[in-house]
Amino acid sequence: MSAVSESVLSLSRYYLPVYRPCQVVLVRGQGSRVWDEQGRDYLDLAAGIAVCCLGHCDPDLVAALVEQAGRLWHTSNVFYSEPSLRLAQELVDVSRFAERVFLCSSGTEANEAAIKLVRKWAAAQGRLPEHRTIVTFRGSFHGRTLGAVTATAQPKYQEGYEPLPGGFRYVDFNHIEALEAAMVGGDVAAVMLEPIQGEGGVMPIAPGYLAQVRALCDRYGALLVLDEIQCGMGRTGTLFAYWQEEVVPDIVTLAKGLGGGFPIGAMLAGPKVAEVMQFGAHGTTFGGNPMAAAVARVALRKLASVEIAANVQRQSVALRAGLEEISEAFGGVFTQVRGRGLMLGAVLAPLYAGQASAILEVAAEHGVLLLQAGPDVLRFVPALNVSDEELADGLVRLRAALGDYVSRCRG
């Protein structure tokens, strides 16, 4: 490690230690490559946790940001600004269901807004507080704020934050009988789920399950809330993951890829709930600021293109095939590769169970950046415009990294 790296990393003692970053100081990015301060390049198959959907420093996004930065940075929502209004209209138009949009700055804020909207809607229906329950699924991840982390049905994210807010109920993912049992009492106001669970191990929804959930929501008078913060904006091969199921939701939340790397979140509200929240019912200081909205408008246009959809589908096949070939080359490192589009998870074989974090470190040593989704799953969420050459290079580096790791394990 260079003296510069050591000097910069020494500053980490001033940062609340809630992260455990790879010991690399990144200083520049272009496309699906990033560089550290020593000039070493890395193939980025993590994309800032599925955020940099158009790669690093996409020229069109940079141009939009620079242009808006020279005009107007921030107004708050006390005043109108054109970029946020235009973005809201474009999200409504492209969503195929929404009537109104709430803009914020992150995914957890979008989910908090959705939770509050569900509760407001239930109250407007005359439902008592005990009849405003929200059902979520084990393995889910909806954010870190107190409401969102309570919706997140994973105890490891909740421990130590008790007492948690009430009014949530958890069921097993992809089990329709369990869901109906949780709803039959008539106290459920909404069902909230990710079409693909990201932090929960890259677990895709079972074919036909979302339609069954929609039917139960209709039967028991509940809203359907879809968290597409990670799986939306083209990542699964269609702009919205729910399009593949031909289901109409009531609320959809977005963030991550929507800004292409610039912080933004959005909650899309359908006709049942679009008019429920009126003046003063909710708000944000930074949400929908002109710079974020200007960048997101360009990102949305590009992510909705047929070119991006085609590339996601093609590279998904290549990435899946590459991972399966690498696994076979080393005696079955992975038991399966699951997911959709460019949101794939490689499940570690029992011999390597619990070692995802260690593998990530070795991968970085070999110049490829990955994520994990729990201790047993390597997560791959590259830029949606990743090129053939970039992906091939990433797979070469990953093969070398896994070969190195397997050799170390075998002594």
From Swiss-Prot:
Give residues annotated as binding N(2)-acetyl-L-ornithine: 144, 284
Coiled-coil region(s) = none
Q: Which cofactor does it need?
A: pyridoxal 5'-phosphate
Q: Known catalysed reaction(s)?
A: N(2)-acetyl-L-ornithine + 2-oxoglutarate = N-acetyl-L-glutamate 5-semialdehyde + L-glutamate
**What Gene3D superfamilies does this protein's entry cite?**
Aspartate Aminotransferase, domain 1 (3.90.1150.10), Type I PLP-dependent aspartate aminotransferase-like (Major domain) (3.40.640.10)
| Compartments, record wording | Cytoplasm
Q: What is this protein called?
A: Acetylornithine aminotransferase
What is the native source organism of this protein?
Xylella fastidiosa (strain Temecula1 / ATCC 700964)
